[in-house]
Structures are given as C-alpha cells and as structure tokens.
C-alpha cells in the first residue's frame, strides 16, 4: 500500500477511500500510483500593491494569489494551515473537489468545520479524485475578496490521453479588487442605512492590474512603477498550441475574457470535457473554470492583449489587461492597439447563447437520470429583514448557526438549527418576477434540505426583480460536494409543467458552478450520493454574506467519525475534550 493510501486510510472513511481508488483504477484502466503532496501555508496580512495601490491583503506565505497546487488524479493533498492573522479566524474551501469520504475537509466554516482561530494550525487532507482545473479560497466572512485564493490543477494519470492536443499548459486566474477592506465592506452591508460595496477599483489577471493613481486620495500610497503591478506576461512561441486554464475567483463581477486577435476553442468546464466550440470571447462567472486552446498563429512581430471586461452589470471598472508576448519580442513591448472592450455588457441574449453552447464531449457523456425524485424551486429575491437589506430564497434569508451543520447532524445536536423543513417552492403561479415585490419583508432561517441518500434531485433557480425597479442581477451558483447536470436555461418564469419537457437529457455538461441569468431560470440535477452536509450558494461574496444560500444534508449516518480538529465552536466545544 502506497504512502498516500495508508495515510488516507487513517484519516478518512476506509471503505469510501478504497472505493475511490478502485474507481480511478477502473475508469482509467491503469494502476494509479498515487502520491502525497505536502504544503505548509502561513496565512497572514501583508501590505500589497497588486494594482499599484497599497493596501493590506490576506496572503499565503506572503503571496497573493497563493501557490498553485499541482497533482495527478488520485493523489492526496495535505495542507498544513497556520492562521497568523492575529485577530481573525479563517477557513479554506477546496472549490470543485468533492471530498468523497472526507466531508469535514470541505473547508466551509459553519457548515463542515469550525474556523481556524488566530494562532492555531489546522491540517486539511483529501484526495483529488478527478482531473481538471479547480480553485481554493477563503470561506470565512468576506476574506476571499482580501486575496486568499489560488488554483488547483489536477493532471490525468500517466498514459491517459485527453481528447485534445496541445504543446504547452498555462493558467490564469481572474479577480476583481477593492481598496476598501473587507471589514468596511461587510460593515456597510450589515448596516442601516445599507451601504453597497460598489464596483471594484481594478480587475486582476494572476494578481496584477493597474489602477489610475491620479484618482487615489491624498493619503493613499499608489505607485504606478511598482513592479508588483506590472502586467502579467504570457509568453508564447509562434506556431505552438496552448492550453490556457482560466479561473474566475471574482467577488462580484461577471467577466468577458478574450485574447486579442485569436480564436479560442473551449475544451473543459469545471473539470469536465466539453464538446469543442470556437469563440472569440469567453463569458466566465465567479467560481467557474475553463480550459481553452489557442494557437500562436498571428503576426509574430508584435505582442497582443489579454483582456477582461465586466458584463451583466454596468461597468465602473477599467478593462483588466495582461500581455500575450510572442517570443522573441521583449515581454514589456506594449501592443500597438488599445485593449479590447468586449461585447456590450447588457447583451443578455449573447450570454444565454454561450451558456446553451456548453455541452459534454461526445466521448465523455455521463447521461443524467431521466427523471428526478424531488424538485426544489428557489426564488432568488432581494428583501428587507428588520430594516436590513438581505438576499433570500423563497423569502427566507440564510443565517449560519454557531455550531457547524455537519457536527450538529452527526452528533444529533437538534437544538442547533431549525428542524422544520426549508421551503420547497414559492407561489410561482401568481408571483410576478418582473416587478418589485409587493412585500419587501422576509425572514431569516437556519433550516436545511434533508435529501434521501442516493436520490435524484432537481433544483430550479428562478431569478426575479430586485427591490429597485427594472433591475435583476446575474447570480453564479456553486454546489459543494457534487457535480451536477445543467439541464437547461430559460428566460422568464419557470413552469414545472412545461419546461422539464425542454431539458437536455442527451449530453448536458456537468459542472459545480452555474450562472442564473437575470429574469431567467436555470435547471440542474444531481445525485445525493456523497454523505455529508453541503453548502449551495451564490458565489458573489456579498450576496452569500447577505443570506443567499442553503444547505443540503444527505446520508450523514454514513459519515465516519468526525475528527476533533474541526470542533471547538458553538456547542461543539464540549465534544473536543480537554
């Protein structure tokens, strides 16, 4: 037995981990010699100038973005996290990693673990069971927007051939960036009167952007020549084909990405192979990852722009740029053109069409069950709760209990959260999604959705008008612990008697994050086959902070003994022992 298997055997559920290893073996046809990858991270605040404006950022070993985790399918990742933030807790979510057999290491504070308190050390240990492109990021308060994030790249096992060819593999991570601290942002969101976070000051590519220092206040430190904010440079060799992994970790912005003058072929989405299609611009929403192929086949005497622009909300942020450097041109040689500005930000049809185009690769289709056992319809609305502005689902705004759900469920702490069922639907026959709600008021709740283990569940996300007239927002929804089939998108109101007949049950893509377009609906289907408690929420940082999320429970009785390291908060203090 290899070191990774024996170590995983000690920390996780032996039967599930053995099943996972056997599954990897059977699906690849190869004996996977898994490895253990050890990482030692120190989480601390450092002064950083990613867009030339100096501010405090949450860093990993002094850097933001954090280090990229590279592994092969079946490997074990061990991350020793020391919280050196002094006055803040922390938790890290491994976005897109299903945590089969290790639900306690999902890294979701309040759902699967207590936070890592200041000065403490916590060890995450999990298997990366599928190849693809994934993320990690803070999952405590609004720390993600402060810089705690990075990439996870999982390669196929040696000898396995992917359904596309390329010469080199590169990665970029896209982000939006504010100069106000997360404390200032969170305080405004939780205040009366409500203070919105506003549009980001900059867009970052691999942690680099450019703020106009002439706009900085008199007490600000902003240096346009700081090397920390020099543009990221992607160097290419003429004639070669590149796989570019693109991940979005934005806290607010939906983005449109393009490589000036080059076509891109989409081949992967959230770790699943896509039926290839060619685009000039890629729409990418927070929490999504894609792989695209492009060939360096343009005029080699010049450099080109990598550019991203805000879509789906009126932009207040300049174009984010990096440089595509054709070797042997100097990497700092500026392109002779202006950066592309992308398609119109409010072209909803364009965004719908690209969402519809993402389908499973013909050789890698995993057909969904033809029917579901349960349908949950979630109306997304903005509301007031005791005068505070909140986001709600079926008129309930989510509140996180002090004791994590996984611990409460496993240890039968029934008083920790509301045991009444969460609302399954709303009055879809009479509710007008295009109008301001007649009643702005909602309630807060801690109820969860209890799913029969191994059942098939449909979730319909329904968008609607906000409190402000003629306004609806795009929401990227992320499901922890699972991939789901994307059965369809539509504009207007979902009708459960009509629209299921239009589902794509032939070749739907599987993803872990999906957009809900404004005044529209998105239908997903998943199997409740991963024992644990799993968050499902809008990936816009401020929206989840304001209550836009739910929790699914499935098969908790099948979860192994919980490690005491995840305990220590709320009613779990007594379970941890001396």
Locations of regions flagged by a protein language model:
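Cleavable N-terminal signal peptides of Sec/SRP-targeted secreted and luminal proteins
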Residues: 11-31
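N-terminal secretory signal peptides that target proteins for export/translocation
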Residues: 1-9
